[in-house]
C-alpha cells in the first residue's frame, strides 16, 4: 500500500523531546517550501467520532466545519501520519487545507511543528 500522506525528502521521523516521535529537518528547508501533504479519506464528524477515533486515536486533521481527512484502518494509520508535534510557536503553517509549508527558514536538525489548533476542532 502506498503512503496516504507525503513528506519532503528533506525530513525524517525520529524520537522527539516534545512527544514520542516527531518530524525533523534533515537538510535546510527554505521559507515557503512544501514540507508535507496530508492524505486520507474525507469523513464527517459523526463518522470520525463513532468509527475512527475509538480505534485509531486522534489521526485526523479538520479541513472544513464538519469534514476531516483521516486514515480509516490501522494499516493506513502509519501511512498517513505526518509526525508534526504541537507548538504554540510553530515553524510550519498550512496552505489550503492539507499542505504544510515552512513559515520561516528552518535549519537541518530542527523539529518541525505546527499549531494543532489550526488542524482540529479540540479546545486548546
Predicted segment positions?
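Conserved catalytic SET/PR domain of SAM-dependent protein methyltransferases, capturing the structural core
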Residues: 1-124
Amino acid at each position: 500500500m502506498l503512503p496516504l500522506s507525503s513528506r519532503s525528502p528533506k525530513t525524517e521521523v525520529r524520537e522527539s523531546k516534545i512527544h514520542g516521535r516527531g518530524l525533523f529537518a534533515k537538510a535546510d528547508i527554505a521559507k515557503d517550501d512544501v514540507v508535507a501533504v496530508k492524505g486520507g479519506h474525507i469523513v464527517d464528524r459523526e463518522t470520525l467520532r463513532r468509527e475512527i477515533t475509538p480505534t485509531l486515536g486522534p489521526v485526523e486533521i479538520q479541513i472544513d466545519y464538519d469534514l476531516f481527512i483521516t486514515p480509516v484502518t490501522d494499516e493506513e494509520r502509519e501511512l498517513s501520519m505526518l509526525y508534526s508535534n504541537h507548538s504554540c510557536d510553530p515553524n510550519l503553517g498550512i496552505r489550503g487545507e492539507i499542505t504544510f509549508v515552512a513559515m520561516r527558514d528552518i535549519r537541518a536538525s530542527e523539529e518541525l511543528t505546527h499549531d494543532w489548533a489550526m488542524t482540529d476542532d479540540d479546545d486548546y
